[in-house]
A protein has these predicted regions:
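Short, flexible coil/linker segments at or flanking structured domains
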Residues: 12-14, 19, 37-39, 68, ...
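Outer-membrane beta-barrel transmembrane domain signature
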Residues: 84-197, 201, 207-210
Length: 210
């Protein structure tokens, strides 16, 4: 059911699907030999580039986390993110600093800049079959223009808001540099603490380690 729901959502946004599909497919022929050669040193990669995109989802973060969401407008975004792992404890947990540059399409056309610190859990019992991580990040977010969908949520919406993300990555041990990404991209004022309004974007993409 979860996979069918995601396919139904993303089938409505062919531009996002096209960009992410091309990004996923094109590098693989050149990457396989290099990745297989470096399989034992995957934990030594400290830099990560993530490309992801998806639609604006309603009604709130809680529903999006539970995949109980609806897509009610023609607003979606694509984001490129660069992260650096600055601390790791064995193969259990790591911390990263990440900067992002995003672009909106459809109903909105502004840009977005984000910066965050990420905590990532690395240890799962099935990792030798499907390498898996779960991450939570928090930081700040700036829109180059006030978002209309965030104004619909609250008339006092502004450019600066808190940024929060939840992310799952899945990959094959044979290709240690590459992972599939599902990321929830969330902006909010933390109940008015740093601003008003908010938005949620359930996104898919890929992550490349180097």
């Amino acid at each position: 059911m979860l996979i069918l729901r995601l396919l139904m959502i993303y089938s409505r946004f062919p531009l996002v699907a096209l960009v992410l599909s091309l990004a996923l497919l094109l590098p693989l022929p050149n990457a396989s030999a290099d990745d297989a050669k470096n399989e034992d040193t995957a934990e030594q990669y400290k830099w990560f580039f993530t490309l992801y995109g998806g639609p604006h989802a309603q009604p709130d973060l809680g529903h999006v986390l539970l995949f109980d969401m609806s897509i009610e407008d023609d607003t979606y975004m694509i984001v490129g993110a660069l992260a650096y792992e600055f601390w790791r404890y064995q193969d259990y947990i790591s911390f990263e600093a990440e900067g992002q540059l995003g672009k909106f399409f459809g109903q909105e056309h502004q840009g977005q800049l984000n910066a965050q610190v990420i905590a990532r859990w690395l240890k799962f019992p099935w990792n030798k079959y499907v390498k898996t991580t779960f991450a939570v990040g928090d930081g700040f977010s700036y829109n180059t223009e006030v978002s209309d969908v965030e104004k619909d949520d609250d008339e006092g919406a502004g450019r600066w808001l808190n940024y929060l993300m939840f992310e799952w990555t899945l990959g094959l041990p044979k290709y240690p540099r590459w992972d599939f990404v599902y990321r929830i991209h969330h902006r909010s004022g933390i109940a008015g603490l740093v601003g008003d309004g908010g938005s949620n974007y359930p996104t898919i993409g890929f992550k490349y380690a180097f």
